[in-house]
Amino acid sequence: MKTKLKPISFCGAFLMLAAIGANAQSYNWISSTEGDVWQQAKISLQSKPTGTVDLIVNENEKIVTFKAWGTTFNELDWDALGVLTRNEQDEILHNVFSPEGDLRITRGRISMGANDYARSWYSCDEVEGDFELRYFNINRDKQAIIPFIRAAQKYNPELTFWISPWSPPSWMKIHGDYPVLSSKYNNLSPQLDYLLYGNIGGKTDPDEMKLTGERNGKFPRQLATTDYMIQDPRYLQTYANSFCKFIDAYKEQGIPIDMVIYQNEAYSYTPYPGCAWTAEGTIRFNKEYLGPTLKRLHPEVKLYLGTFNTNRQDHVEKIIADKELQAYISGMAFQWEGREVLPSIRQQHPEWDYICSESECGWGSFDWKAGEHTFELMNHYLGNGCKEYTFWNFILTDNGESPWGWKQNALIRVDSKARTFTYTPEYYAVKHYAHYIGAGTEVIAYKPEGEDKKPVLVVRTPEGKWVVMVGNFQDTEQSLTLQIGKRYLNATLAPHSMHTFEMR
């Protein structure tokens, strides 16, 4: 059954710890626990702390100025939305995209060609040897992705977009197929799996797959030694040209693209559309082909490096150390395991912008624990200076299964048999942030989740309002004490709860 979003009265699950001073600054307190979401109360700052101070907010410091929340426009999301009535679709699109809605998303990610939540494999040009791109087209996009975007634009005409491919056209790859590795979900011959490591090791390691296995703290456990994109200049230039063709084609559809990333997750060796790249191949393509081509044909479009889903810092540093490449780069994009190296990379290159290019999508559980994880991810990425945060699927049917056999979570879950929908715990986790943090909001202070499982983020809106996002992901109550100026925010947080405190 659909979970309604109407505010309801505060029911006593959360306890204020100190008497409220008559002249104290008042805050709205929004809290959520499993089965009892979006409770509202009021709380005021105090003159004294009632516990150990968790975080001291220095209003003269700033981590980053936030820009945008985003989501990805995938075919399976459009199919899920299509299960519902027009009124239900309108409710969802309003809540997700409208400036007056719940999540207020202003940014869209588009896959250039198929990704793992496409209906099936496709690219914009599967005509082998078409180096002039005469047969390049976005016909498949016109079936679902573009109608999906237009439906969102109805609620926010100012949406902007960025692109990244999962795989080049199959004929541009060394084995002539869209996946990296064989599986029962594709037709690639297992005999070609050895290409990933060339003559090193002989066989692929099943634990390299994101879907399964232990990785001993490293992802990937073994880096690919082979570029799956053919490294011949003619192929590389044609591929760079295809990015510009895609930008042009979407512009004709009234969809502005202002940022490009050369590859999604070059370090996931996948049975679905993917492409492994070495550090040398990544540098070569971005520095010698994609960067110069964008600068010449689309100087208004920024080039970011990513999407980095590896925690191998030495590998990332090797790529970004290239001085000629740096001349083309405006920022970096991190997701999944890449979150681990974000803080140190940002410290090395404070001149670049940073984004979370994909929120982690779980395994189809759609449970409260998944909501807590997403809450912590937003704390981590914003607290470590990301200006944008992009979600993956925002709506899926049933168990969220991909055509390539794995399950993922979404912000909204559709029951395809009953033709009903539910706002999931992750939806509310996102609302605790996105409803209050918009463009121009300054991220001021941050405390990571840590052993106490109590992540805290403090921001200041363009109107000068303080907003605090905090979670308690322990099995017991925890106290919260923040120092803001000369006063204190004191509260008791219920077990496994999410909170937003907004200055009134």
Q: Can you name each region flagged by the protein language model?
A:
Residues T71, R104, F161, V260, ...:
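Conserved, mostly hydrophobic/aromatic
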Residues N74-D79, A114-Y117, S167-W171, N264-Y269, ...:
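Solvent-exposed loop/turn segments at secondary-structure junctions
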Residues K447-G485, T492, H496:
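Carbohydrate-binding surface patches
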